[in-house]
Amino acid sequence: MHNLLEIKIIRFLRNVFYFLHVLFNECLDTLKAYYKRWRGMKSEKPLDPSSRRARIIQATGVDLSRDPAMQSLRGVYHMAKSILYADVLRTAVRGGNAPNSSLVNYRTKEKCNILDFMKPGRPLVVNFGSCSUPPFMASFEIFSRIIDSYHERADFLTVYIEEAHSSDLWALKNNKYSIPSHITFEDRMEAAAIFKKSVSFECAFAVDTMKDETNLSYGALPERTAIILDGKVQYIGGIGPFNYDLVELEKELIAVLKK
């Protein structure tokens, strides 16, 4: 068994490789686009309406692969912050004890903990994100469908965390959701209210504290998913935005339900 330090080092090195891979692909796509314009070549083929990119554009107005903020030095910094920093700090690991981090119940406005939403013998499926994160908002319809399909056998929780693309720090061009960084908890609750009005879902809803305890415990920035069963982490999803995969989440939930 690896000790905690070894696990964090391995995770850090894996995330560095992933970060460089993403950065290389982003730079390559940008160079290809510039080359096509320079050569006067035809633009790319029409976008498939069912594709992830098309869903994000339709839901939020943002084209991540063409957004200047994603290709800027600030973009590199924030990607490194979420991929390298937040994920290395997380204590939630598959097979380990689920961190019982602090939250505030959106409906009651009372302090609570994440495991308060867990019931014995039933998986708790957690979805972390914020309004300003395009993949999170664009995919929420899929998450709602998963809730509808499995709510009789599992419980679901959405946790609102810090803004992934706040308007004052790392704004995305044409983003439908222009929300500044949360300075006070009231700011975060107001952002959560915007989210609640923007999407339709039937599950528990909680808001992270201003200490970002849940965000840090689960490496949730910019968005992430997790499945908890009887206090153990059964699944921890990939780092958003590129590895935020609700299809994978559903497959993992089916596997947990078969246990």
UniProtKB/Swiss-Prot annotation:
EC number(s) recorded for this UniProt protein: 1.21.99.4
Nucleus listed as a keyword: yes
Sequence intervals crossing the membrane: none
Membrane topology: Peripheral membrane protein
Activity as a function of temperature: Optimum temperature is 20-30 degrees Celsius.
Cellular component per GO, a single term: nucleus
EC class name: oxidoreductase
Gene Ontology MF, one: thyroxine 5'-deiodinase activity
Effect of U133 to C/A: Abolishes catalytic activity
PROSITE patterns the record matches: T4_DEIODINASE
Reactions catalysed according to its record: 3,3',5-triiodo-L-thyronine + iodide + A + H(+) = L-thyroxine + AH2
Activity regulation remarks: Inhibited by gold thioglucose (GTG) and iodoacetate (IAc).
Cellular compartments annotated: Membrane; Nucleus
Keyword entries, A-Z: Membrane, Nucleus, Oxidoreductase, Selenocysteine, Thyroid hormones biosynthesis
Activity versus pH, per record: Optimum pH is 7.
One Pfam family matching this protein: T4_deiodinase
Entry superkingdom: Eukaryota
GO annotation terms (biological process): hormone biosynthetic process; thyroid hormone metabolic process
InterPro entries: Iodothyronine_deiodinase, Iodothyronine_deiodinase_AS, Thioredoxin-like_sf
Role description: Responsible for the deiodination of T4 (3,5,3',5'-tetraiodothyronine) into T3 (3,5,3'-triiodothyronine). Can also produce 3,3'-diiodothyronine from reverse T3 (rT3, 3,3',5'-triiodothyronine). Does not have significant inner-ring deiodination activity for T4, T3 or rT3.
UniProt similarity note: Belongs to the iodothyronine deiodinase family.
Name of the protein in its database record: Thyroxine 5'-deiodinase
The organism of origin for this protein: Halocynthia roretzi (Sea squirt)
